[in-house]
Amino acid sequence: MSVEPPLALTPTEQQDLETIEKSGLFDADFYLSVHQDVAGSKIGPLLHYVRYGFREGRQPNRNFRPASYLRQYPDAGANNRNPFVHFLKTHGGCHIAHHGLLPRFHLEDLSIGARTLEQLPFFVPDLYHDINRDIERATTDMAEHALLYGVPEGRRIFGALHVSRTLGALCAAKGLDDADYIAPDGLVPDSIGVFYNSRGNVFIHEIASDLCTTLRESGLDCVLLDETTNPDDRPELCIFVAPHEFFHLGQGQDWATGTIIRDAIMFNTEQPQTLWFERGIPFLLMAAGVIDICHQMAESFRQAGLPAIHFTPNIGAERDYLQKGDMQHAMVRVLPPACRSRPDRHTPFADRQLDISFFGGMSEHREQFFARNAGFFAQFRNYFYYRKFTTPIDSSPRDNPLSRLASHVAGHSRIALNIHRDDYGFFEWHRIVKGAMANGSVVVSEPCLPHPVFRPNVHFLEESGRHIPNLIEWLLNTPDGQAKAEEVRLAAMRAIETPAHNRARCTRIRGFISHVWSTPEA
């Protein structure tokens, strides 16, 4: 709506007024609520801002802070010019006017990231303020603050209860059609790099390697790379596995620029309730697309307007079991002699040497489970690797064999136990599928978020923590239980190894990459 000025404006001020009015970024309600002296005057809020407000350092909306903008662009206020008009003319289409603690990203990227965060179902502005009470509510855009300051400062940006409710809603939702995110016959990049951080978790390296192999099987030119690669020599398309880890460790920080991120695909492996997931949020929200190891998480990114797909790599025929050099490792020497030889994943349930195995880090939820059931487990032949992790499981001499050890032990185990780190029930694909099912072990798990391929009581067995001992006792000690276990074990192996399933996954991921690659920037 046009403003009829009750007082004379200079030609420059009149042009400024028209520029601001046309942008739609002046928030009259905000201006009047914050500057109540203007509300009591007879001058319209926009006219007041153009004539007086910008000279007094007043904000025209929640996002534009004149002092911050002038620190970044000192010339914007030269000759008594309005810095907000400079912003509108220089950064058209943006609503964020400063970089906060993310100086290596363009304002255009940050604006997209903040708007996407607003739509992400895990984020609620009022809840972010409730968690971070030191933030001034009236003058702050919560999504902008969360992206530019909250994540870099290590603040929590999602509420735990709301994350739980959102996951439940995502499980119940119909979801968006995969066909909207797949271009079967579209263009693909000439070269692709799948990146992992060499200083990070060794399991992430495995996922990245499997993804790279799957992309090659899809007919794409793909190479496995790490953070030590020269960014100037990067392939046409970069896929960063575990961005919460890659961009925070060592030389990975050199890759955290808007120029790289906006054209890349992120492969998210982290759970939404964790601080690690929140650390990866800026890279996920400003990327060209997201691949997620969790079906529900992919749906959440789609709801936020991001091209996203749920995908897990094919698992090849080769297995990475213990090597000769691993045999002197302390955790290998405690294995029974019969379990030190190379396992055969096709060994039937009844013929395996270990009854139950578990690999995982310490958490309060797991601590309660194992303390409560210690007496029960003591009667079986177990291998439990359970410790407090303060750093990633990396390639150090202490940790290097652990990934191979987990697969090796699962290859000798009847049952692989899956106890969640907390109460969220995330489907831990690497532990459940890659680590256990692919090595012929039967997974007994607490209830998980629904998975589109692997179903409870078909490919794995699911029970509440309280009744898991009863289920295990039935599986190990009764003919009916052993028959059911073998049925489940074989069904899981078929789901992993059937060539048609693997070809379908290849077609799907190629189609998604083609969709992202051939979709023009907004």
Question: Which residue ranges define each predicted feature?
Answer:
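Charge-rich, low-complexity intrinsically disordered regions
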Residues: 1-177
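Extended catalytic core of nucleotide-activated donor transferases of GT-like folds
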Residues: 176-183, 191-306
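Catalytic binding pocket for nucleotide-activated donors in carbohydrate/polymer assembly enzymes
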Residues: 189-226, 278, 295, 302-303, ...
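Short hydrophobic "strand-cap" motifs at the C-terminus of beta-strands
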Residues: 267-269, 358-361, 460
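Carbohydrate-associated surface elements
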Residues: 296, 315-318
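Short hydrophobic/aromatic-enriched beta-strand-loop microsegments
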Residues: 308-314
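Conserved catalytic-core segment of nucleotide-activated headgroup transferases in glycan assembly
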Residues: 319-415, 476, 482
